[in-house]
Amino acid sequence: MKKAYWIAKYKKINSQEALTKYAEKAKKIIESFGGKALVRGGKYITFEGDDFIRTVIWEFENINVATECHESKDYQEAWSLAKNTTKRDLMIIEGI
């Protein structure tokens, strides 16, 4: 199977504290599904399209595992810590 990439592009963060709490819990959950962090913030340049304030990319063994992680009760509970104070685009993309 092809690897999959979980890409989160953050548009708005109203509470850094809430996002930090989410990130601490989510990191452990995602890693328990075999997720490997490739990008967690850092410098960036936007050449085209909408600008984002933060981008996070995780690599998974395949799209099924990435989806299972996202839909898990534990991950959804972690996301509930930040979802009311954070606006983001989130997608899972299969690699080549």
Q: What spans do the regions from the language model cover?
A:
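Short S/T/G/P-rich N-terminal loop/turn motif that feeds into the first structured element of a domain
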Residues: 1-54, 61-67, 71, 94-96
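C-terminal structural segments of small proteins and small subunits
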Residues: 66-91
